[in-house]
Amino acid sequence: MLKVPEHQVAGHIASDGKLGPLVDDQGRFFKPLQGDSRGEHEAKFYESFTSNMKVPDHIHRYFPVYHGTQLVEASDGSGKLPHLVLDDVVSGYANPSVMDVKIGSRTWYPDVSEEYFKKCIKKDRQTTTVSLGFRVSGFKIFDHQESSFWRAEKKLVLGYNADGARLALRKFVSSNSPADSNLTPNCAFASEVYGGCNGILAQLLELKDWFETQTLYHFNSCSILMIYENESILMQGGDDAPAPRAQVKLVDFAHVLDGNGVIDHNFLGGLCSFIKFIKDILQSVEKHDETDTSLLENGR
């Protein structure tokens, strides 16, 4: 039985009779091929990437596993349509917090139509795409105090400036109520989610190492998904704790082009900028912890 993804935070959402992705109960994600060339283009990318022996094994884990295409009943009731069949990257989580971040200082690319170029450049300038090299596209957080999800409003997210993006990244790893805009995010989960040898930062740095040399593809208008489960941190790895914790995935490949032997500076530059934001948050948390420790020691 196919259903609308519960944890999708950006992109085309299959609701109110609209065409969008679906998921099943077996951990598969069905993404409809868009009617123009973009859907076919994305399928060809997955086929190329999956079989490309030049892509290191450790890099493949940052991409959804591709299972080909399949005709399934479309979410808009238009009948059977071809869909990409991918691993549902959040299927292993009970209550995942998810953030979608579009990487790159531009989302358009050479030889696009004038209409598409104008659409992209307008949105790129209105968001932090041009100024920061990335933009937060959407996110949701599991509020363990309320045992429910809080989702950032799309209009608010698209209006973020640099401070707004920084605040969102801090809120994403905080334990205090995400719904209360008057609260300063406490970044209670930052060290466990962003930090550590297997945390978000370590994964982003591994991707960065590859992007500094790879010339196979140019990842235009692609996103990074960050996923984690705060309950597993709160339960401190007990027997009943959900797993895994933090994960990075790259998604949305309808606009990927051949690299033709040239480094993808657009994606790499945006990735480096995003990494700096994550590093800054971790450093501020470490500094705060050191201050608290010093105050405790002096108060003995």
Curated annotation (Swiss-Prot):
SUPFAM superfamilies: SAICAR synthase-like. Its EC number is 2.7.1.140, 2.7.1.151. It is found in: Nucleus. It holds the Pfam family IPK. It catalyses: 1D-myo-inositol 1,4,5-trisphosphate + 2 ATP = 1D-myo-inositol 1,3,4,5,6-pentakisphosphate + 2 ADP + 2 H(+); 1D-myo-inositol 1,3,4,6-tetrakisphosphate + ATP = 1D-myo-inositol 1,3,4,5,6-pentakisphosphate + ADP + H(+). Belongs to the inositol phosphokinase (IPK) family. Inositol phosphate kinase with a broad substrate specificity. Disruption phenotype: Loss-of-function mutant atIpk2beta-1 (T-DNA insertion) is fully complemented by AtIPK2alpha in tissue but not in seeds, leading to the generation of phytate-free seeds. Increased sensitivity to 6% glucose during seedling development and decreased germination in response to the gibberellin biosynthesis inhibitor paclobutrazol (PAC). PANTHER family: INOSITOL POLYPHOSPHATE KINASE, INOSITOL POLYPHOSPHATE MULTIKINASE. One of its GO terms (molecular function) is inositol-1,3,4-trisphosphate 6-kinase activity. Does not bind calmodulin. The modification Phosphoserine is found at residue 78. Down-regulated by KIN10 through its protein phosphorylation. One of its GO terms (biological process) is pollen development. Expressed in leaves, stems, roots, siliques and flowers. Detected in vascular strands, stigma cells, the abscission zones of fully elongated siliques, the root central cylinder and the root tip. This is Inositol polyphosphate multikinase beta. Induction: Induced by auxin, but not by salt, abscisic acid, mannitol, water or drought. InterPro entries: IPK (IPR005522), IPK_sf (IPR038286). Phosphorylated by KIN10. Interacts with KIN10 and KIN11. GO terms for cellular component: nucleus; pollen tube. Keywords: ATP-binding, Kinase, Nucleotide-binding, Nucleus, Phosphoprotein, Transferase.
